[in-house]
Amino acid sequence: MFDFEYQLKNLPDKPGVYIMKNSLGEVIYVGKAKILKNRVRQYFRNSKNHSEKVKAMVKNISEFEYIVTDSEIEALILECNLIKKYKPRYNILLKDDKHYPFIKVTMNEDFPRIIVTRNMVKDGSKYFGPYPDVSAVHETVDLMRRIFPIRTCKKYIKENGENIRPCLNYHIKRCNAPCAGLISKEEYGEIIKKAVGLISGKNNDIIRELKEEMEKASMNLDFEKAADLRDKMLAAQKVTEKQKIIIGNFENEDYISLYSDEKDSCVQVFFLREGKIVGREHFIVENTAGENEGDIIGEFIKEFYSGTAYVPKSIYASAGEDLNLLENWLTMKRGSKVEIKIPQKGEKKDIIEMVKRNSKITLEKFKIKLLSDKRLNENILIEMTEVIGLEEVPHRIEAYDISNIQGVDSVGSMIVFEEGKPKNSDYRRFKIKTVKGANDYDSMREILTRRFKHGLEEVNSIVNKNLSLSAGKFCVFPDLILMDGGKGQVNIALEVLKEFNIDIPVCGMVKDDRHNTRGIIYNNNEIDIKSNRKIINFVTRVQDEVHRFAITYHRSLRDKRVLHSVLDDIPYIGEKRRKALLKHFGSIENIKKATYEELMKTPSIDKKAAESIVSYFRGRKGE
């Protein structure tokens, strides 16, 4: 039993990170503190001043632990890492944690490529961006490939390496085939130099050169070549026009503000790149009643910039807490000075007010759509209840599916729809443990047995400890179970429920010969739902989602198994080094051929690891 009084009394008077856990040992909140003793004790005292979210969290805390750090900045870095690792339910977790795309020129390769990436790493490549307009970035890269004969393949091509047969791109004059040794590293480098100049907006000579070549070809009556050069010139002009939007002599700045109603908040970020607003993002933060604006924005900054690949020089916010600490952390992340300012007047203040107004509009639209969707989903569930003949409206629906290929890497999936919407946080995956071969019925029996056994155990634990249902992973039972299959799968589910003395209606989702949803099996009867477009769309959506979730997990296990058979058997090669090797060399075949010196150039590969790889593959050659 966790002794709260003793643990609170003995908290250290130092900076660090505290980790709150529920009765199941799951991490539900991670926070950092300048003085651990003061911060952690606050949660268990003066509850009148707590926000509704904090009150709900404290009710679910069964124990806590802490990690002492040397400084507050270390605590902040550790906090961000632990939030990424555990994704605690009471921390602000941005649902749209995407990186904005960069244009990447792989200068660390003998024959560089121009690609789109969302991750910026120190690997010797040149990066341009980030750009919020994803489609514009892809269009720019496509245009660059039309203008310059640059390779697009992922092959590991080395100067003076083994020559291979060139692909179709060479024959249609989209690549100069460095893979076949048809262009030198120096000649290829000159092409890349021109391409980089065009992307950066610093070299528009290429347009003039293309125009001169086009006119020359036209005079020589080589109209096919002239037309090709004309298309390249127009593409180059289009690239230059795009760069005018994103290249200039202005600073890059982000502006952050929020609007809160009585329950939730909308945080909005406007991105200024080279003096122009080039994009914006909004994030709905739920259950913020009672929290002040500075705390929400401070938490948002930590979450947002720990995920994004790009940190601007200046960030302007409408409020904020621990700004000096956040500035120091972002400065470390960026590698140069970052300032967070709260403008009080002038143009910057006007932009912040504009961001705030947009946050209000976005939150209001979100609530209106939420209400509209809620009414629509309610109507669908009511109609489905009547058509199928259920006794009650199914507010919570669980759907199950099995995925395998000839019994290998067999997995099961459980997805959840609440009030007609997916509840991703309650999705669960099961690796089949007791069934050998392709036996979907026994596999389904196993995952349902595990699901409801865990659920009943959690319910008993929660009742005994007087906790809320949110403390468990399986303790909330559905109002309806949907099986991806016919009568056989339905009967398996009913048998499992009977064993546990649980009464939940079970339906089967059946498809026609074209693999389209056809009807619902309930009480051994097939109910035709084709005439009701809303119901069939909903059931199809559930069926597609449970299948997607199952097959995604199956593929991840299959890929892991395939990779494990080779790289994971090599001493000193863990997951991080495995990924680095595949990223650097492109394939296992290229890793096998790599020399010790080439391996040493791979990020994270040290002398011992390189020797281990060489030794492993030499040994396999003799097998």
Swiss-Prot record:
Subunit (UniProt): Interacts with UvrB in an incision complex.
Domain UVR, residue spans: 204-239
InterPro entries membership: DisA/LigA_HHH, GIY-YIG_endonuc, GIY-YIG_endonuc_sf, GIY-YIG_UvrC_Cho, RuvA_2-like, UVR_dom, UVR_dom_sf, UvrABC_protein_C
UniProtKB keywords: Cytoplasm, DNA damage, DNA excision, DNA repair, Excision nuclease, SOS response
Protein name: UvrABC system protein C
GO cellular component, one term: cytoplasm
Organism of provenance: Clostridium acetobutylicum (strain ATCC 824 / DSM 792 / JCM 1419 / IAM 19013 / LMG 5710 / NBRC 13948 / NRRL B-527 / VKM B-1787 / 2291 / W)
Annotated function: The UvrABC repair system catalyzes the recognition and processing of DNA lesions. UvrC both incises the 5' and 3' sides of the lesion. The N-terminal half is responsible for the 3' incision and the C-terminal half is responsible for the 5' incision.
Record-annotated GIY-YIG domain positions: 13-92
Gene (name only): uvrC
